Amino acid sequence: MGLVTANTVGLSGLVAPKPNVQIFTATSGTWTKPPGCTRVYIEVIGGGGGGGRGESAGGNGGGGGAMARGVYDASALPATLTVAAGAGGAAGTTGTSYLGGIGGTSSVTGSGFTLQAFGGGGGCRPNGYDSGGGGGGGTSSAGARGTGASGDDSPGIGGGPTIQGSTTGDSLGGRGADGGEGPAAGKCAEFGGGGGAGARAASGGGANGGSSIFGAGGGGSGVRSSGTAGSGGAWSSYTAGGGATGLGSWALIATYTGTSRDYGCGDGGAGSPPGGDGGAPGGYPGGGGGGGHYANSDGGAGGRGEVRIFAW
């Protein structure tokens, strides 16, 4: 959830110095251990998957990025660490064959040290059929795309690790949540990203993106031709929806974009409403993008990843 940066009072009654806080949002960087520090806390969040473009059916949502974190003795870490914040998955457009991009991996690496969080799966091409949402990113692998074909609307599988009893439905530990099958909502996760919502070919509303307690929310799906678009999944929740609110009529995309935060993770973007301009981007870090509506509107881009390092 993030470390509080306010000064603290030690046992001696003296005010301790503020921790050294460094936030990385670019794809490459270097962290140098501050002199005198004894503890280091690290958070890494993978990029969100992009939402799928609609195609005679609503577009499906992208999966959210995972969160990984740890507290370390400063003496156990190398003097420098290489840092990479994963990019958000590209929006599904004609230029991407209607496919939303898979979110990038965020990592902190050094001699004998690795901490990673993987990105969410992108929305698939619906091809005029029901289609499955992108899987949420995990702490050992990225989420996968779902499928959209006659008789096959399978959801994208959440990223690893594989955890016994957590291969279907909502996930736990670092496993990413599965996307929604067909027009169903995305599944929820603990440290993995929430699953993107599945989309329907028939008329009717979209489905909600899956949420995550510590990871980022998945994107909602767009509508076929009428009804209310699916809402994005939320950070700090284990119930689908709760992120950007899906709407039932045209509005500016900014109205239903996922919430971004300087702590925790981002929420998923909502799907496109009827006549809308496309699915909304996911919030940063890690929110999945929303799906477009049936009339060939683009999906929303996934939220970028992020790395935060606190030393004191």
Regions found by a protein language model. Name each.
Residues 4, 77, 129-130, 134-154, ...:
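Generic hydrophobic, helix-prone segments enriched in Leu/Val/Ile
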Residues 114-121:
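Short amphipathic beta-strand/extended segments with alternating polar/hydrophobic composition
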Residues 61, 88-92, 100-103, 122, ...:
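Collagen triple-helix signature
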Residues 10, 121-124:
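Residue-level detector of flexible, active-site-proximal loop/helix-junction positions
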Residues 117, 284-286:
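Bulky hydrophobic/aromatic "packing anchor" residues in well-ordered structure
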Residues 1-41, 71-73, 306-312:
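Enriched but not universal
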Residues 21, 39, 80, 105, ...:
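A residue-level signal for beta-strand positions that form part of recognition/binding surfaces
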Residues 23, 30-34, 44-110, 123-128, ...:
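Glycine-rich strand-loop-strand elements at beta-sheet edges
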